[in-house]
Amino acid sequence: MSLVTSLTYVLPHRLLSSLARALAYSDRPATKQWLIDTVTRKFGVDLSEAQEPDPRAYPTFNAFFTRALKPGARVPDADPAALLMPADGRISQLGPIENGRIFQAKGQSFTAAELLGDEAAAAPFNDGLFATVYLSPKDYHRVHMPWTGTLRETVHVPGRLFSVGPDAVRNVPRLFARNERLVCHFDTDFGPMASVMVGALLVSGVETVWSGVEIPRYGDRITRKDYRGKGIVLEKFAEMARFNYGSTVIVLLPPGVARLDGRLAAETSVRLGQALARRQ
């Protein structure tokens, strides 16, 4: 375990993330430009695909970080049976949900019920599939729909804000089931689908297209929002949410509806819109 990961056990997660949020939304020219230039240089951010390629044109660091792409920069897989990759990033893990458990790393796993905050909500995904995608600081930070779905419910599950980088994934037990997260439940033509937006250290927020800022929230109680009857339908490949810094999205699918794309494996670099799985 790295020193940084060890320190995250004792660091004041909330305070650091609140400070990161204040900096991310600062419109002071010197502050925002220093942040943009530092992150661009350190992580090799490529702005050539951005709708706004000039790093000095962004009013805040957050605007830079959640930047839109040029039209056509990402194209969905042409196969109508393809469920799409929800984001740019890297596959952390993917595979079957076995005995209700989701694989995190060697010797590490957690239950779908822990992740979703609800045994009943997890039941339809038993023996189904999961894919965990890590968005690094250099990546496009908007999350899109793998398949067309009608929003049924969101569940905010309070928790810690550990780093979700590779070393933390290997060493922090049940990491994704311990961090603060927003669970988005959708109804689709094949049944339920869940997209879980996992918060992390220095992540200053998670926003959805239907409700705005969802994370951070304060308190230690699970919060549910019922969207049944609201008619919020998001089409396949449509934007659903964005991270205000790098983090992780986990997609859950029920059993018997799809096969994962055979070219994918842990550590594979992926792009929004490529095939994640194909309907059976």
Curated annotation (Swiss-Prot):
Pyruvic acid (Ser) found at: 247
Entry's Gene Ontology BP terms: phosphatidylethanolamine biosynthetic process
UniProt membrane topology term: Peripheral membrane protein
GO cellular component terms attached to this protein's record: plasma membrane
Pfam families xrefs: PS_Dcarbxylase
Active site: 88, 144, 247
Entry keywords, A to Z: Cell membrane, Decarboxylase, Lipid biosynthesis, Lipid metabolism, Lyase, Membrane, Phospholipid biosynthesis, Phospholipid metabolism, Pyruvate, Zymogen
Documented EC number(s): 4.1.1.65
Cofactor: pyruvate
This protein's pathway: Phospholipid metabolism; phosphatidylethanolamine biosynthesis; phosphatidylethanolamine from CDP-diacylglycerol: step 2/2
Cellular localisation: Cell membrane
Cofactor details (free text): Binds 1 pyruvoyl group covalently per subunit.
PTM (free text): Is synthesized initially as an inactive proenzyme. Formation of the active enzyme involves a self-maturation process in which the active site pyruvoyl group is generated from an internal serine residue via an autocatalytic post-translational modification. Two non-identical subunits are generated from the proenzyme in this reaction, and the pyruvate is formed at the N-terminus of the alpha chain, which is derived from the carboxyl end of the proenzyme.
Residues with site note (Cleavage (non-hydrolytic)): 246-247
InterPro entries (alphabetical): PS_Dcarbxylase (IPR003817), PSD-B (IPR033177), PSD_type1_pro (IPR033178)
An annotated Gene Ontology molecular function: phosphatidylserine decarboxylase activity
Catalytic activity: a 1,2-diacyl-sn-glycero-3-phospho-L-serine + H(+) = a 1,2-diacyl-sn-glycero-3-phosphoethanolamine + CO2
Binding partners and assembly: Heterodimer of a large membrane-associated beta subunit and a small pyruvoyl-containing alpha subunit.
HAMAP family membership: PS_decarb_PSD_B_type1
Family affiliation: Belongs to the phosphatidylserine decarboxylase family. PSD-B subfamily. Prokaryotic type I sub-subfamily.
Function: Catalyzes the formation of phosphatidylethanolamine (PtdEtn) from phosphatidylserine (PtdSer).
Protein name in the entry: Phosphatidylserine decarboxylase proenzyme
Species the sequence originates in: Xanthomonas euvesicatoria pv. vesicatoria (strain 85-10)
Classification lineage: Bacteria, Pseudomonadati, Pseudomonadota, Gammaproteobacteria, Lysobacterales
